[in-house]
């Protein structure tokens, strides 16, 4: 079953929820070129394998692919270039402290529109082990079975 995207969600990193425990989410602006915004609005952004890195008091998203805009010709930029995130210094310092803990990283979860601006939801994540992934899959299957049984019981 395919989930219906909300109207303002432009791209989603669905695999992140399977591979990481998401401790906290933060909204950040993203510095883009005009043709990148048009391409993202057309749904040509990919968040798979992307992550955020803190360098010199700034946060950048790495390996986020935005396909070149078809009508952009000379104004198009490299699809995998680093994109700067727009956050307050205090937020950046707080995130740097959280990410410095062992096993934690910043992962972009969704790209969406808010008041005409492209925003990114960053997750402070800790990687799951294989047994954690199996446990969460078993728990989902168990919940699905319970819901199915309750629905079946309420029919009669």
UniProtKB/Swiss-Prot annotation:
**Mind naming one GO cellular-component term on file for this protein?**
cytosol
How far does the signal peptide extend, from start to end residue?
none
Q: Does the keyword tRNA processing apply?
A: no
Alphabetized GO MF terms: RNA binding
Tell me which UniProt keywords the record has, alphabetically: Cytoplasm, RNA-binding
Where it mainly occurs, coarsely classed, is cytoplasm
Q: Which GO terms describe its biological process?
A: trans-translation
Pfam families in the record, alphabetically? Answer: SmpB
> What subcellular locations does the record give?
Cytoplasm
Which Gene3D superfamilies does the UniProt entry name for this protein?
Answer: 2.40.280.10
Q: Which family is this sequence assigned to?
A: Belongs to the SmpB family.
PANTHER family, alphabetically? Answer: SSRA-BINDING PROTEIN, TMRNA-BINDING COMPONENT OF TRANS-TRANSLATION TAGGING COMPLEX
Task performed by this protein? Required for rescue of stalled ribosomes mediated by trans-translation. Binds to transfer-messenger RNA (tmRNA), required for stable association of tmRNA with ribosomes. tmRNA and SmpB together mimic tRNA shape, replacing the anticodon stem-loop with SmpB. tmRNA is encoded by the ssrA gene; the 2 termini fold to resemble tRNA(Ala) and it encodes a 'tag peptide', a short internal open reading frame. During trans-translation Ala-aminoacylated tmRNA acts like a tRNA, entering the A-site of stalled ribosomes, displacing the stalled mRNA.
Specify the protein name.
SsrA-binding protein
């Amino acid at each position: 079953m395919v989930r219906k995207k909300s109207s303002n969600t432009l791209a989603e990193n669905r695999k992140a929820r399977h591979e990481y425990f998401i401790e906290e989410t933060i909204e950040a602006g993203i510095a883009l070129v005009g043709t990148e915004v048009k391409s993202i609005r057309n749904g040509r952004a990919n968040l798979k394998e992307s992550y955020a890195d803190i360098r010199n008091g700034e946060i950048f998203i790495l390996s986020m692919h935005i396909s070149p805009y078809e009508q952009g010709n000379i104004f198009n930029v490299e699809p995998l270039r680093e994109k700067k995130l727009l956050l307050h210094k205090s937020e950046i310092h707080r995130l740097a402290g959280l990410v410095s803990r062992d096993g934690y990283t910043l992962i972009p979860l969704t790209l969406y529109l808010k008041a005409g601006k492209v925003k990114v939801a960053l997750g402070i994540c800790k990687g799951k082990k294989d047994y954690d992934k199996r446990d969460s899959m078993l728990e989902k299957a168990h919940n699905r079975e319970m819901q199915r049984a309750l629905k079946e019981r309420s029919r009669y």
